[in-house]
């Protein structure tokens, strides 16, 4: 930036991870840009497989039919735009595995409805599931700020179910990665936490047509 640097409204966790990765590759003697990007593409490809595995598990839990779950995983793996976009440097795709993991743990924390219509106890402790779901949702927000609406929707659903404790646990878990990662990074760069998030909101309020 010319002149005095100022916040631009970008979450810095994802660029920061790339900075550390490129520094590591430089230290290992890999300084060719094309080879560096091959490494980046491979890491993104491996990370995108979380979507396939988690999508399979979500479909299996919702349908109780292995065939439906298998087809769901197959579509997630092969549907034309998924493999193409998953290896790109797109925060929309990089945050997707975190959202899928959050959805999975939310499902695990909600009692299942059996064939008799009675709710069975959740397979694992609800508190643990909600905490993990919140942490993964918070990590997704660290990558792409707009995913805050996913976390907001999940929190609202818990409130509508009158699960007050669960909503507090989930909300607290969402805030934890934001405070530790984005808050710390902004504090280090700008001397105040959450500067980039505030700038993002301010810019969009001032430029609603962009």
Where are these regions (language model features)?
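Short hydrophobic/aromatic helix or loop-helix immediately within or flanking a transmembrane segment
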Residues: 4-31, 93
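Short acidic/glycine- and proline-prone juxtamembrane loop motifs at membrane-interface regions
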Residues: 84-94
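Transmembrane-helix motifs of polytopic, lipid-linked glycan transferases
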Residues: 38-63, 101
């Amino acid at each position: 930036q010319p002149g005095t640097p100022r916040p631009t409204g970008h979450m810095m966790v994802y660029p920061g991870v790339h900075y550390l990765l490129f520094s590591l590759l430089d230290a290992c003697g890999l300084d060719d840009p094309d080879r560096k990007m091959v490494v980046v593409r491979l890491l993104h490809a491996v990370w995108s497989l979380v979507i396939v595995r988690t999508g399979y598990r979500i479909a299996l839990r919702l349908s109780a039919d292995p065939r439906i779950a298998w087809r769901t995983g197959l579509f997630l793996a092969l549907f034309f735009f998924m493999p193409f976009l998953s290896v790109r440097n797109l925060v929309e795709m990089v945050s997707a595995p975190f959202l899928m993991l959050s959805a999975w743990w939310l499902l695990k924390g909600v009692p299942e409805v059996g064939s008799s219509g009675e709710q069975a106890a959740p397979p694992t402790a609800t508190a643990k599931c909600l905490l993990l779901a919140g942490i993964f949702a918070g990590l997704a927000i660290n990558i792409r700020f707009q995913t805050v609406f996913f976390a907001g929707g999940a929190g609202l659903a818990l409130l509508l179910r009158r699960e007050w404790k669960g909503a507090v646990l989930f909300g607290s878990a969402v805030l934890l990665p934001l405070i530790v990662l984005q808050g710390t990074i902004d504090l280090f760069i700008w001397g105040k936490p959450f500067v980039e998030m505030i700038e993002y909101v301010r810019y969009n309020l001032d430029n609603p047509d962009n």
